[in-house]
Amino acid sequence: MDEQKETEAVEELTKAINFKLDMQMLRLRAAFYESMGDISSALQDCEAALCLDPNHAETLDMYQRAQKLRFQS
């Protein structure tokens, strides 16, 4: 996916999240942030999603991956 489409997707997800906080939307936005190289924002969204569902395996995996990427930078 190109950067412009990723940015548009993040903007639309942000609108939806602002309307109604949702773990799946937070996780999806975190994935876009990670893909765009915005590891800090990806971590924030993972943390927010994990507050809603602390045992969600995919989000835990993404959070751990993003933490590793942050420490590699």
Can you name each region flagged by the protein language model?
Residues 1-73:
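Alpha-helical tetratricopeptide repeat
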